[in-house]
Amino acid sequence: GIVDTPEKLTALITQLREQPRFCLDLETTDLDPRSAQIVGWAICWRAGDAWYLPTLGPTGSQLLDGATVVEAMRSILENPSLRLVNQNIKYDLMVLDCHGIHVPADVIDVDPMVGDYLLDPGARSHGLETLIEKYLHQTSISIKELIGSGKSTKNMVNVPVEKAAEYASEDADLTLQLADMITAKLKEQGLWDLYWNLERPLIPVLVEMEQIGIRVDSDELRRQSASLSIRLNELMKEIHGIAGHEFNIDSPKQLQVVLFEELKLPVKKKTKTGASTDQDVLEELAALHQLPAKIIEHRHLSKLKGTYLDALPSLVHSRTGRIHTSFNQVVASTGRLSSSDPNLQNIPIRTAEGERIRRAFVASRNIPVQALAESGASTVAPKSKKSLFDEDDIHPVDAASRLSLQMSREDRGDSNEDWCLLCADYSQIELRVLAHYSQDRELITAFEQGVDIHTAVAAQVFGVDREAVTGEQRRMAKAVNFGVIYGQSPFGLAAALGIDKKEAGAFIDGYFAKYSGVAQFIEETLSDVGRNGFAKTILGRRRFIDGIRANRNRSLNMPERTAVNSVIQGSAADLIKLAMLAVHRRIEQEQHPGRMLLQIHDELVFESPRSAVPTLVELVRHEMQNAMKLSVPLVVDVSVGQNWLETQPA
């Protein structure tokens, strides 16, 4: 039913107080939770029966007052004994947070999206419509029917209340039913623990990280962009000079003519539109002529400029002055987190220009959490963040006070100079996981002695003392170490190292002869996956894989490579998620003013007042190194600095 009068609201709230568990689904005006206003609240606590509370709608609609509903719902949602079901709950928690409702972590019950991700990590979508068809075998009202799609999309505010109510109520009802089915399936398949104790408690940690965001120095990005423009122009002139005439570097057609017709370079591979000019081809051709190398550099720099230097400033939130990336919990089938808008996990750090982008990510005290809230809401500072706020705790938000709040906190002599970033990075985490799984004596001993693992492997395979290992030998050992994790073929290794296939094959054989435990682990993993149909991580996360052959040779096919990699990379992902929970818990317990901002695969980035850095270093290192007991010690490298590029070991 539609709850659109104060009397109906009072009656519903009275009933709602008695429900230990219900599903809430918010309809909003925006996909960005920090800009979204709530259009309506859909609530369901038993199948087939849902309520809709409209707070925004077309002119003339009968609506409830938004602030009144927020106040009424606050006491219910902030009650730690409640259990709340919701599809993609991370989004709704952020919207609620921006409206001053801080839902306790323990309140989160089942998010069908996250549950389905554990049951079927390779699925193309874990969206609500997909899940309704998959588990309940029915179709639901599509959001497209309500607001259209593409250019003609209208805002949820303009959907008639009856239509919005029908859509939202059905969503809440079906989400509740899905939650029960998915719970049963998770328990049946032995995945409930992984959901309840790892993925579920991670949600509020990600909410907090996304809400805090990270400060970006837009002026620094503009300066870097300007200097890249100059370099790109110079490069273009050099390229045209070598070719002997001007042409469009970004046109594959024109590039084909220059490389293969004019310079007569050999065609390495064909596509539908003629000879390929992709990265791999250019890298091969670069050995024969200087032009392809210049093209590679030009492509790299123009991608950096477009994707990061020019795009990042526009992603800075106007009200917080920070970038708020989204951490995706249900995208990577290995169990890793991914990040988007912007993707901070693939800033290329292999080149000086790519690495320099990190200089623009800086430490800063100011997070105007109040600035996130909509005008008219009154917001309460969360207990764990008391140190960041003024003495009085409740702020009615209007545009003017929002600005003064921001000012008052910046002017307290606690300038940005007094804050720093802290980066904590697991050292060789995947190779340590490999040592743990394979129980290979040589590998374990090297890690126990704390020697450089690539040097140790080079010494073993080349049969020389560690002191005598050359830089080139170490580089080869490093390529093999990582090649093993990803099941690289002699052909792939040869290409990576620029040696011939026979030499690469001999090197791989030498490696497996010395590290027989690793060879055995790979064999056993492939037999298990062949038998069960899935690879399993250290915490029991599964990834389904077909195509493991019964009679294999040394060079693995794609599914076999995926199988080995899923166990290693997936277990490393489990480990860092455990570490995030442990660090977050300790920061809250000790009311430490530091805060976790980013997770970049094996690295966590924090921000802290300089005075509190020593305690944060200890806390982070201790929790990360003890997140899980492996057969080899976990080592964490911690460094501190004003920005993400220039940090010094702590």
Annotate each language-model stretch with its function:
Residues 366-378, 382-383, 395-411:
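Intrinsic, low-complexity polybasic segments
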Residues 230, 234-237, 241-294, 513-561, ...:
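C-terminal polymerase-core module
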Residues 154-157, 208-211, 317-332, 337, ...:
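Conserved catalytic core of nucleic-acid polymerases
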Residues 78-81, 94-97, 120-123, 136, ...:
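Hydrophobic alpha-helix feature that most strongly marks membrane-spanning transmembrane helices
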Residues 103-121, 128-130, 450-454:
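Conserved beta-strand -> loop -> alpha-helix junction used to position metal-binding or nucleic-acid-contacting
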Residues 428-467:
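Basic, low-complexity segments
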Residues 65-81, 360-363:
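Short, basic/hydrophobic alpha-helical segments
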Residues 1-59, 87, 104-107, 123, ...:
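Conserved "right-hand" nucleotidyltransferase catalytic core of DNA-directed polymerases
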